[in-house]
A protein has these predicted regions:
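P-loop/Walker A phosphate-binding loop and immediately adjacent motor/lid segment at beta-alpha junctions
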Residues: 77-83, 87-91, 132-161
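Short Gly/Pro-enriched loop/turn and capping motifs at secondary-structure junctions
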Residues: 105-108, 127-130
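Non-cysteine beta-strand/loop elements that form the S-adenosyl-L-methionine
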Residues: 119-128
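N-terminal pre-triad scaffold of radical SAM enzymes
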Residues: 2-29
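A generic structural signal for alpha->beta connector loops
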Residues: 96, 118-119, 142
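Conserved Radical SAM active-site core
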Residues: 1-7, 17, 35-100, 107-112
Length: 161
């Protein structure tokens, strides 16, 4: 998997101070996309174990509340295994920190993926420049923010906000 940028101490992509990973590669090609340079899967740099270690180190700061994964498209078949591995490792080391993930897919299309065990918040839906929004953390009004919640018996549900 390639990535475009690792942004430490990001306050724009999720609640609190976060480490943000922008992956490369996206087939959605949304009109008006703010990150068109990330569409090519070979754009940016190859993500390595050293990058994962760097993310883990950055997240050790008490000011950091979690990891945000954006794109490109994190849930594309070419990215999903590495994204799952990153999320699993982060949750193993920092179970109290949240993972936010942006995708052009709808949550119901990807809800059974292994990565969803580790993700706490999903912003889903393709960017649509004809539908401006004032909703936080979304680029267009058709996008949804889903928050994982656990019932008293430990069952997991996704609640739209």
């Amino acid at each position: 998997m390639n990535y475009m940028e690792i942004r430490p101490f990001d306050t724009a992509n999720g609640e609190g101070v976060r480490v943000s990973l922008f992956v490369a590669g996206c087939k959605h090609h949304c009109e008006g996309c703010f990150n068109r340079e990330s569409w090519k899967f070979n754009a940016g740099k190859v993500f390595t174990y050293a990058n994962l270690y760097g993310i883990i180190q950055l997240m050790g700061d008490n000011a950091v509340s979690g990891l945000s994964i954006l794109g490109g498209e994190p849930l594309d078949d070419r990215n999903i295994q590495e994204v799952t591995d990153i999320c699993k490792r982060v949750k193993t080391v920092y179970p109290e920190k949240t993972i936010w993930l942006w995708t052009g897919f709808q949550l119901h299309e990807k809800i059974n993926l292994d990565v969803m065990k580790y993700v706490d918040v999903v912003i889903d839906g393709k960017y649509d420049s004809s539908k401006p929004t004032v909703k936080p953390y979304r680029g267009s009004d058709n996008q949804n923010l889903w928050r994982k919640e656990y019932g008293w018996q430990g069952d997991c549900q996704w609640r739209a906000e």
